[in-house]
């Protein structure tokens, strides 16, 4: 077995106190700097004094270079240093040989070709340099630096034809845009405008970019060829078509025309661009168009620009949120103002295609008005009745009538058919609407239509159908009775009112009873009206009913000699007395106060001071008292101050309570013995008052 290897023990530090002298980082750096080795002196310069020493020196250097190349032939810097050293020694042939060996070793190294050609040009070896550039561009035609150097050399040698020939060879490879621009600039330096134009003709098809077409057009303009520049812009618009065109081209085209004072042409270009470009790519175009119109346009032109800009904004809004119906309404109003029928219809079709995402009426309210406006436009502006009818039918088929409907739409459709003299279609549509979704508005609209047509039998049938669906609707009963009254059939109207008031459930019974009473009063049936008031009071004791009853009695006429004021006052006063007594029994203090105030005003108008004083004696006084606040859970939450009314009649009706309090006090005094001190009796005297106070408070709260 191998013995376990023993690890050296960690030396224990006996003294862990900090050293007295602390070493800083600055001190460490200073000591390291002081201990640096001294800089070696440069080697001595060697002076060569005769050809033998020179030959020996050259042999040693060449041997060093060759050794380096044998060690690593792939290091380009060794070749370059070797060739440049030979060039310094004026050994051009040797240097050329080294460059050739380097190219044989790595012929695709751009630096080698450039250095080699630079050496030939520096030593004025033009043919060698030309041959070298030919070889370079043949091997690597995509290296633009070779072509730039080659053409520059030929141009410096004033060999313009040779430089042009090199450019042509270069252009056959369809280089980048800068190369074409360099060729154009070369021709322009020698005033060869036609040649430059030919280069541009080829350039814009090799690199079909908008900016290159704009450069071509500006080239023509800068040399005075205005028609040529315009023709270039027109060709560019045709070349790109509607799919690939950009707003930059139209802006440049319009500014060109603006510079030539052709403002109408510029305006047409802007409008054409706005019509054919997608709306999300015309922001700068709008700005340029607006500036142009502000500088050169009239009021109509400026308004046209503003309208176009607003159309673009609305297009963005509806594209971002297709269910933004408010934006659709604004957009459609703008389109309708222009009057382009096809565009209006197309926009309406786009708008109505955005159906609300959920079958909830709140989402559909604004959407339905798109259909309504569409139908009204087709009827009133386009005057296309068949298309209008189809719009209404399509919309009605789209609405989920089992969940909700729109009565307004049914009625508009029926009214449209009436205007088209299609009465049967209108009735059929409304009948279908009532059968599918009986709504109050539908019934009333249908009834109003039949009343206008003087079809009263149909009105009766519709009212009967209406009341079958909603017998609790008081307005329907009132309208039905009003119709019969207008037709002179009072018995039928009275029977309708009787049926109405006998319904077990009504939404607004007070209006129905009032209408019934007004109906009888208008017929002069005073006794029947009084009976109706009595019947109504059997059902409710509301203070307003009593007040209305009193006013009714006050306004009656008795006999043929005119109104009997005294009799009316007595009848009305009797009603007030009955009402006061009834409300007192019910304990309705608030209503009782209202009644007494109305009674007081009545007596003031009657100018009867005696009766007026009686009423004033009945007026209550208002007091403030505290009562407990009890929550819905029955928990007491504190006290609050409330106002209450104390009526004199109620206080007079409390003798029994006062008698009970006095009897209790007498009993207390009797229970006290004769031996008790008087102070005890005196102390017990307030007890009945304390007992009576709660009784009074309780009574006042009843």
Curated annotation (Swiss-Prot):
A GO-annotated cellular component: post-mRNA release spliceosomal complex
Keywords: Developmental protein, Differentiation, mRNA processing, mRNA splicing, Neurogenesis, Nucleus, Repeat
Motif (Nuclear localization signal): 620-628
Keyword Nucleus: yes
Major subcellular location class: nucleus
A GO MF term: RNA binding
InterPro entries in UniProt: HAT (IPR003107), HAT_Syf1_CNRKL1_C (IPR055430), Syf1-like (IPR045075), TPR-like_helical_dom_sf (IPR011990)
Region (Disordered): 670-702
Family per record: Belongs to the crooked-neck family.
Quaternary assembly: Colocalizes with a complex containing snRNP proteins.
Role of this protein: May be involved in pre-mRNA splicing process. Involved in embryonic neurogenesis and cell rearrangement during Malpighian tubule morphogenesis.
Name of the protein this chain belongs to: Protein crooked neck
């Amino acid at each position: 077995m191998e013995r376990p290897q023993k690890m050296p023990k960690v030396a224990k530090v006996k003294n862990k106190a900090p050293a007295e002298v602390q070493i800083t980082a600055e001190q460490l750096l200073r000591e390291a700097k002081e201990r640096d080795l001294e800089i070696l002196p440069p080697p001595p310069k060697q002076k060569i004094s005769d050809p033998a020493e020179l030959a020996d020196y050259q042999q040693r250097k060449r041997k060093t270079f060759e050794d380096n190349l044998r060690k690593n032939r792939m290091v380009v810097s060794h070749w370059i240093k070797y060739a440049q050293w030979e060039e310094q020694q004026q050994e051009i042939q040797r240097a050329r040989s080294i460059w050739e060996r380097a190219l044989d070793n790595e012929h695709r190294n751009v630096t080698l070709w450039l250095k080699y050609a630079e050496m030939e040009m520096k030593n004025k070896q033009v043919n060698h340099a030309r041959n070298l550039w030919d070889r370079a561009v043949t091997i690597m035609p995509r290296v633009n630096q070779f072509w730039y150097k080659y053409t520059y050399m030929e141009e410096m040698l004033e060999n313009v034809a040779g430089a042009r020939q090199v450019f042509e060879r270069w252009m056959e490879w369809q280089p980048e845009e800068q190369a074409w621009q360099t060729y154009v600039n070369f021709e322009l330096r020698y005033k060869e405008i036609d040649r430059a134009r030919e280069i541009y003709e080829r350039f814009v098809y090799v690199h079909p970019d908008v900016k290159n077409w704009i450069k071509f057009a500006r080239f023509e303009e800068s040399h005075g060829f205005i028609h040529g520049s315009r023709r270039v812009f027109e060709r560019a618009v045709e070349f790109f078509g509607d799919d690939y065109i950009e707003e930059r081209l139209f802006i440049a085209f319009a500014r060109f025309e603006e510079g030539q004072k052709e403002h109408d042409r510029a305006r047409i270009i802007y409008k054409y661009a706005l019509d054919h470009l997608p709306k999300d790519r015309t922001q700068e175009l709008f700005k340029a168009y607006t500036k142009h119109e502000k500088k050169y346009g009239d009021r109509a032109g400026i308004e046209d620009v503003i309208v176009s800009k607003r159309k673009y904004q609305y297009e963005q809004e509806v594209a971002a949120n297709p269910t933004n119906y408010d934006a659709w309404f604004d957009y459609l109003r703008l389109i309708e103002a222009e009057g382009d029928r096809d565009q209006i219809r197309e926009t309406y079709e786009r708008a109505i295609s955005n159906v609300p995402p959920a079958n909830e009426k709140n989402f559909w309210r604004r959407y339905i008005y798109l259909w309504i406006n569409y139908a009204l436009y087709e009827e009133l502006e386009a005057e296309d009745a068949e298309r209008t009818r189809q719009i209404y039918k399509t919309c009605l088929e789209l609405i989920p009538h089992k969940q909700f409907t729109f009565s307004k739409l049914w009625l508009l459709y029926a009214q449209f058919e009436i205007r088209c003299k299609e009465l049967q279609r209108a009735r059929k549509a409304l009948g279908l609407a009532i059968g599918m979704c009986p709504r109050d508005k539908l019934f009333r609209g249908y009834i109003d239509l039949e009343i206008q047509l003087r079809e009263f039998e149909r009105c009766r049938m519709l009212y009967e159908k209406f009341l079958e669906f909603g017998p609790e609707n008081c307005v329907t009963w009132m309208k039905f009775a009003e119709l019969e009254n207008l037709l002179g059939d009072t018995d039928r109207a009275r029977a309708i009112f009787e049926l109405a008031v006998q319904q077990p459930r009504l939404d607004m019974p007070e209006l129905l009873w009032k209408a019934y009473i007004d109906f009888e009063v208008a017929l002069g049936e005073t006794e029947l009206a009084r009976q109706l008031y009595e019947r109504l009071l059997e059902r409710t004791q509301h203070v307003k009913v009593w007040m209305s009853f009193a006013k009714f009695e006050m306004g009656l006429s008795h006999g043929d000699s005119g109104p009997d004021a005294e009799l009316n006052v007595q009848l009305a006063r009797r009603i007030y007395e009955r009402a006061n007594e009834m409300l007192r029994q019910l304990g309705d203090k608030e209503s009782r106060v209202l009644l007494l105030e109305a009674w007081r005003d009545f007596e003031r108008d009657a100018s009867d001071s005696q009766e007026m004083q009686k009423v004033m004696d009945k007026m209550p006084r208002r007091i403030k008292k505290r009562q407990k606040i009890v929550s819905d859970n029955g928990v007491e939450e504190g006290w609050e101050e409330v106002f209450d009314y104390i009526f004199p009649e109620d206080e007079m009706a409390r003798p029994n309570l006062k008698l009970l309090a006095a009897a209790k006090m007498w009993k207390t005094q009797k229970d006290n013995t004769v031996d008790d001190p008087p102070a005890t009796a005196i102390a017990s005297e307030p007890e009945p008052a304390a007992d009576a106070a709660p009784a009074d408070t309780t009574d006042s709260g009843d």
